[in-house]
């Protein structure tokens, strides 16, 4: 595999074997002898008709023939696939991965779903078509023409219900791949998804350096360095080129968690989570520090606040002081900054790449920030109406309906008068409110449901229905369903398919909406709320409840912890104020640490820890918290938990954590440390007495 690389003689997967050897007669004869010995000893015979030989490009035809004769294998591995991927990929050329685009095309043809609604098409495209290239994308960088073909097939089917459709594409593909909450449909941008998938391979090289793959690639491409600084050589394999392509997204999101700080270069490494670039924004000329450990007080891992403020601009200094260096960390740790757990995920990497693309396109086209109108889309996708009508309203908000006015503007229709009445320009507002057919329909709706159409302005009516200012949400949902019914009726009349009747249409949308709501699609309103109360630990155990308060405006936090026995009797309680905290999750982690310190001080041996933060509870129970956003505190929590004879961590709703909740709101900058042992304040006694009549578990 390379001068410095690990030697590989064979690879085994299930009942398949891949054997590596030099292309010469001596090696071939020796392998044939080994296979024969195996056959005589085990009774199992290699099926040479199903076997194949792959030769490197510098193997001559005579040597190929000699090796094949010695092994008794006639077939040469040319274009063979194993587990769905080409067994050997040299330079990826046009045609190597065309099968992915062909499979998507065949999928769409096989559905035979020309009459599917947009909701049905969305489901099939996301669940099936987009999943086709996922496996090859995890190993190779697919050529741009292949991605373009796949995009074309998906886009054609979306807008025209056929892979060969040439209907109007009302929105460019990059907008369709925008998240639903920002006005798109959330389809995958395939090249970006490909890069995010390949980033996962690079992450494995970083986090699993002892794996066979990592050792082979290191020996061949970066024997004296590390993956993040490795370069691409002229004769690099397609696999290595693909992994380096995925490394780009890794370099955008990798951060170093501060432990000793001696390996973190202040100005070149990513290490400040509160700054978008993860590096100091400004390099002051008078700053002489180079590594993070130089910013600590001598002999500690506590920030030298004066030095930090002298070395950085105020905004950078404030973010640095929020970082809590790991007192128990042996080394600075690489982590993925876009996940709380610090582990790379394809989802978060894709989201990062997509956000960058959206911002870049918006700056080029001088478009407003898509998040400015995000409330519209959030309300739209929360409407309790059938999915096909939600997507219909998405088209309405974007003005994607082929009304005669719009088609005339695009020079598709010669004139723009209404198909039904012929008396006015056919815009959507006319179709659903002004046309005589529409007026009859709304009269029937009023008779049936009692809902009256509010006064709506033609320029803003689409968004007005989503604001809730002109009518209730339930009325707006019925009106939107009515608009959909009028539009489908207009299309039916245009194509002469059915005779559309106002009364029947009104009854249909009313019953459809009732059936949808009653079908159990939305169960949140019917869920019974069960009040959670504090429960005591088993006899002989102690339970410590923890909670935290966090102020986003001034980045301060406070913690509270209450230690009780199985009867509910409070043994001790404590609270502490922290003047510089990065976020609410860090405050909750500090509360857990303080709670365990309290339990240790009271000489508890069997401890149940209870917190109302599910993320912190999961991290405390996990062995992978060393990369998380609370990495420094996580190591302290882990060390404290191991000091007890028995330790359990559980999550509880806030209602069952009232005592700790009240404690966390007591300390302040003027009274930063508070503790109670024996003589408890009245407010804490009230909560304890209310909780103490519960049974232990």
Roles of regions detected by a PLM:
Residues 1-697:
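A helix-boundary/hinge signal
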């Amino acid at each position: 595999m390379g001068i410095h690389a690990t030697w590989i003689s064979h690879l085994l997967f299930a009942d398949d074997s891949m054997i590596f050897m030099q292309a010469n007669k001596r090696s071939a004869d020796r392998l044939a002898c080994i296979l024969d010995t195996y056959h005589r000893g085990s009774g199992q015979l290699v099926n040479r008709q199903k076997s194949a030989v792959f030769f490197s490009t510098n193997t001559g035809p005579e040597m190929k023939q000699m090796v094949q004769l010695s092994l008794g294998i006639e077939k040469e591995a040319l274009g063979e696939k194993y587990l769905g991927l080409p067994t050997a990929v040299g330079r990826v050329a046009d045609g190597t991965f065309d099968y992915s685009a062909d499979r998507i095309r065949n999928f769409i043809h096989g559905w035979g779903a020309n009459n599917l609604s947009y909701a049905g098409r969305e489901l099939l495209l996301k669940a099936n078509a987009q999943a086709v290239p996922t496996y090859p994308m995890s190993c190779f960088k697919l050529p741009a023409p292949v991605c373009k073909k796949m995009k074309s097939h998906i886009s054609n089917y979306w807008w025209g219900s056929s892979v060969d459709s040439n209907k109007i594409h009302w929105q460019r593909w990059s907008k369709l791949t925008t998240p639903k909450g920002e006005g798109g449909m959330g389809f995958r941008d395939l090249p970006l998804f490909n890069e995010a998938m390949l980033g996962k391979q690079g992450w494995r090289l970083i986090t699993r350096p002892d794996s066979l793959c990592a050792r082979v690639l290191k020996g061949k491409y970066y024997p004296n360095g590390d993956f993040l600084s490795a370069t691409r050589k002229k004769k690099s394999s397609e696999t290595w080129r693909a992994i380096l392509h995925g490394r780009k997204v890794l370099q955008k999101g990798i951060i170093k968690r501060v432990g000793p700080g001696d390996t973190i270069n202040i100005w070149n490494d990513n290490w400040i989570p509160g700054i978008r670039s993860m590096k100091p924004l400004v390099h002051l000329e008078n700053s002489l520090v180079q590594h993070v450990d130089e910013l600590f007080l001598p002999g500690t891992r506590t920030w030298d606040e004066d030095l930090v403020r002298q070395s950085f601009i105020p905004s950078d200094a404030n973010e640095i002081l929020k970082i809590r260096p790991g007192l128990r960390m042996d080394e600075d740790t690489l982590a993925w900054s876009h996940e709380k757990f610090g582990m790379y995920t394809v989802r978060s990497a894709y989201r990062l790449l997509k956000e960058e693309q959206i911002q870049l396109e918006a700056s080029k086209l001088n478009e407003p920030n898509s998040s400015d109108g995000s409330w519209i889309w959030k309300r739209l996708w929360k409407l309790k109406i059938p999915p096909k009508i939600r997507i219909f309203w998405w088209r309405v908000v974007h003005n994607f309906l082929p009304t005669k006015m719009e088609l005339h503007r695009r020079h598709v229709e010669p004139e723009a008068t209404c198909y039904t009445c012929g008396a006015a320009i056919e815009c959507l507002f006319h179709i659903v409110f002004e046309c005589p057919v529409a007026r009859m329909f709304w009269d029937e709706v009023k008779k049936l449901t009692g809902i009256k159409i509010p006064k709506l302005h033609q320029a803003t009516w689409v968004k007005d229905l989503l604001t809730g200012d002109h009518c209730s949400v339930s009325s707006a949902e019925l009106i939107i369903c009515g608009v959909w019914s009028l539009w489908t009726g207009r299309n039916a009349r245009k194509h002469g398919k059915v005779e559309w009747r106002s009364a029947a249409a009104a009854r249909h949308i009313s019953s459809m909406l009732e059936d949808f709501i009653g079908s159990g699609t939305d169960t949140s309103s019917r869920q019974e709320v069960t009040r959670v109360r504090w429960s005591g630990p088993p006899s002989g155990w102690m339970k410590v409840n923890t909670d935290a308060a966090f102020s986003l405006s001034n980045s301060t936090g406070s913690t509270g912890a209450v230690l009780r026995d199985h009867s509910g009797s409070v043994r001790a309680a404590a609270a502490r104020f922290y003047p510089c905290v990065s976020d609410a999750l860090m405050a909750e982690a500090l509360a857990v640490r303080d709670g365990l310190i309290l339990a240790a001080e009271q000489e508890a041996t069997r401890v149940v820890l209870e917190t109302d933060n599910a993320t912190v509870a999961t991290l405390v129970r996990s062995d992978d918290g060393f990369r998380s956003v609370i990495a420094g505190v996580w190591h302290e929590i882990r060390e404290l938990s191991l000091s007890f004879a028995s330790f359990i961590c559980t999550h509880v709703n806030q209602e069952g954590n009232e005592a700790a909740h009240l404690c966390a709101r007591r300390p302040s900058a003027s009274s930063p440390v508070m503790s109670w042992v024996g003589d408890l304040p009245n407010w804490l006694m009230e909560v304890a007495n209310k909780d103490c009549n519960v049974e232990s578990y």
